[in-house]
Amino acid sequence: MEAAGFLYYSPDPQGRQQKQHGHHGHFLAQPNAAYTISASPQLLAPTPIHFPSQLVLGGRGVPLTITPSASPSLMEPYRDMCSESATTDLLFNPATPPLTHSAVSTPSLSYAMPTPISNHGWSSEEPVIATVSLSDIHLPSTPADYFPPGLVAPSILKSNASPPPSISLNDLHCPALSPCSSQDSFNESDCCDPRELTIQSPTPVEIKPDILFPPMASLSGDDDQFLFGGNVESFLPLASKVTPYMAGDYNEELSDLGDSEDDFIQNFSESVFSNKRMRFDDDSENEQLPSPPMSTSSSRQGSVAPIKVLKRKLLKVKKEDTPEEMSEEQRLRSFKFGSIDSACSSEPSSPCSEKHSHMVGHPISPHVIRRGRKQSLTEDPSKTFVCHLCTRRFRRQEHLKRHFRSLHTEDKPFACGECGKKFSRSDNLTQHSRIHGTGAVVLGVLTEGEVPVLGSQFMEDESMHSPQPFIVVDSMTAASGEIKDKSSDDKKSRKKRKRSDE
């Protein structure tokens, strides 16, 4: 019998044959006398791989061909997959590593593995079965040899490569596909026995005693000892040092401080506080509040005594400085009410003498901090209209009336035609009229005939303050009228002289 070639499996590294034939490798024939192929090839009956498709209607398999049964079956008959041909197993890719040619002699024990010869896959009508012995299977010496020639093995696998183990017949029965390390390299120390695992007890925590801080000073005047050089004893609980409380001592100490409060109280009338034009600049002064009650121990009394002396000295110094450092508003108030008291003192029977008898004031030069536009504080003799209450001077009578209404009488003769709100000044009314969207405002313009009427109204409103507040104003208006008449006569005479000269 002639020597027939045998087949060996070589993978396709580029994967070109995979697209054409559906598998990874191809088989090539090589001459070898050790393997023979039977002259009469074993023919296998071609078995259809795919069964004819059936039309699915309503989830049931209905055959396309006519069956001898009267009606189609209700359910598709169960098909056992194990009863099919063994050729369907060839549809899956082999799980063995790539095989290479080996010159190992044929062993006594060999196994036959059916492999088709045709490169066209499973469509061959007469497949040829070839036998490959297990001795031809060459395991790679290192894990890096597992990779095809086109790929590069990682450097880790190359560095950790070990010599191939010896293969025995008993090992061939086991599908061991990767080299395993020898059992001699097994180290018992690498394993961990769970019985030897023990939980270490935590280290005991040392409990330190709490740090004893000195007690805080209470709010009952204990801070005076530390601030003003009192006797400071060792830090002990306050209960051992505090003496029983005496109600009489508390009242006595408050009575000592009560004298200092009277120095800071200013007895102003209610009209001063209700005046919207006045300002009080007393916020800068420090409020003198009474200290909290203190205990009656001898050491504390010695430390508190110099405090009261210092307070009284400070109050005396402030009393001496108040006339010089008096603000402009306070001077205005003292001058205003001082002039009223002086006017009332001339007439003891007037009702205002009783009303302002409790107020004491002295006339001071009227230096006033004015609000709004900046005005001259010097006494201008050209301002002929003088207010008899605050002795302010004005150039026009309208200015004096406006000042008198806004500050002294608070009369509001100007009323809004839309909402009826009243104002003491006409400019305030014009500004208010812009809210309603109308620029035109009807103002009651005063004529010469209406001056006495307004004067009589002011006299009625101010009758309780002064007997005749507008006597000076009326005399001034008469004098100013005479001056105006004289100036007009002089102008006319000058014109006549010019005409006569011509």
From Swiss-Prot:
UniProt keyword terms in alphabetical order: DNA-binding, Metal-binding, Nucleus, Repeat, Transcription, Transcription regulation, Virulence, Zinc, Zinc-finger
Principal location class: nucleus
Source organism of the structure: Arthrobotrys oligospora (strain ATCC 24927 / CBS 115.81 / DSM 1491) (Nematode-trapping fungus)
PANTHER family: C2H2-TYPE DOMAIN-CONTAINING PROTEIN-RELATED, ZINC FINGER PROTEIN
Pfam family, one: zf-C2H2
Subcellular location: Nucleus
Organism placement in taxonomy: Eukaryota, Fungi, Dikarya, Ascomycota, Pezizomycotina
Description of the deletion phenotype: Leads to significantly enlarged and swollen the hyphae, with an increase in septa and a significant decrease in nuclei. Remarkably decreases spore yield, spore germination rate, traps, and nematode predation efficiency. Increases the expression of the arthrobotrisins biosynthesis cluster.
GO biological process: regulation of transcription by RNA polymerase II
Chain's role: Key downstream transcription factor in the HOG1-MAPK pathway. Plays crucial roles in the regulation of growth, conidiation, trap development and fatty acid metabolism. Negatively regulates secondary metabolism such as arthrobotrisins biosynthesis.Also regulates autophagy and endocytosis.
Protein name: C2H2-type transcription factor MSN2
Gene Ontology CC terms, in alphabetical order: nucleus
GO terms for MF: DNA-binding transcription factor activity; RNA polymerase II cis-regulatory region sequence-specific DNA binding; zinc ion binding
Zn finger (C2H2-type) start-end: 385-408, 414-436
InterPro entries, alphabetized: Ikaros_C2H2-ZF, Znf_C2H2_sf, Znf_C2H2_type
